[in-house]
Regions:
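Class I SAM-dependent transferase core
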Residues: 14-71
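A structure-centric signal for secondary-structure junctions around beta-strands
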Residues: 9, 32-35, 91, 217
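Short acidic-aromatic active-site loops that bind/stabilize oxyanions
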Residues: 2, 47-51, 189
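N-proximal short alpha-helices
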Residues: 11, 27-31, 80, 192
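Single conserved hydrophobic/aromatic residue that forms the stacking wall/gate
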Residues: 1-13
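S-adenosylmethionine/decaboxylated-SAM
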Residues: 52-234
Length: 234
């Protein structure tokens, strides 16, 4: 019998993953009551919001980085924007972009309910069109939009990110599809799969970024922009 440490390790992790996540989430001290309400409403309406593990990690990053200006791509119903406004230790300004018309009024109402409407600015429309129009820099950017568009947003995102700033991208592992062969991925998901792989390669190989890919939730990347000579960025 092969008793090598690597044999069956993936199966062990797979079996234990759900129990581990449940245990880790049980240690969470929770959010404010309004965030709990908005989260439950989103879940009841099948609106995707950041997972519990990601919520904890985002709060940790905010406590460490204390960003003054935050850009979010992908508002949904405003849950993560409100969470960042609530748990950033400094009085930050948040700009968030949303393209789905049905969710925009819900997000606006949620900002008012949370008392964050003056702190959060919602830009309505396609991020691909809005990002090029932005000129002020940000010290924290959270990407949680259409996964197949991350690679297309990247040039403007990096232009807007301050040196020393943090870029967080959510849902980058695609429920494990990212490690599969191209042919093992369902045909309708192959374009997203290809683009996400390109995005992850760019994040981890650019000289002006230091990036970690972490198995938090459905996978996240955390990148810091560093100063390099112009001809060394690629």
């Amino acid at each position: 019998r092969d008793r090598s440490p690597s044999r069956g390790l993936g199966d062990v992790y797979k079996r234990q993953d759900e129990r581990l996540v449940t245990y880790i989430n049980s240690l969470d001290t929770g959010n404010t009551s309004i965030l709990d309400q908005i989260e439950q409403e989103a879940l009841d309406s099948y609106v995707p919001i950041i997972r519990k593990e990601m919520q904890q990690f985002l709060k940790l990053l905010l406590a460490m980085k204390r960003p003054m200006r935050i850009l979010e791509v992908g508002t949904a119903v405003g849950f993560s924007a409100i969470l960042m406004a609530e748990y950033d230790p400094v009085p930050c300004e948040i700009t968030t972009i949303e393209n789905y018309e049905k969710r925009i009024p819900i997000a606006k109402e949620n900002f008012i309910r949370a008392g964050k409407e003056k702190q959060i600015t919602l830009l309505e429309g396609d991020a691909a069109q809005i990002l090029p129009t932005l000129t002020e820099s940000y010290d924290f950017i959270f990407m949680d939009a259409a996964k197949g568009q991350y690679i297309h947003f990247m040039p403007d995102i990096l232009r807007l990110l301050k040196t020393g700033g943090t870029l967080v991208s959510d849902n980058v592992l695609q429920d494990g599809d990212i490690i599969e062969s191209h042919y093992a991925v369902i045909r309708r998901n192959r374009t997203i799969y290809k683009r996400m792989r390109e995005y992850l390669y760019e994040l981890t190989h650019r000289k002006d970024l230091v990036t970690a890919v972490l198995p938090v939730g459905d996978g996240i990347t955390v990148s810091t922009k560093v100063e390099v000579e112009n001809d060394e960025k690629e």
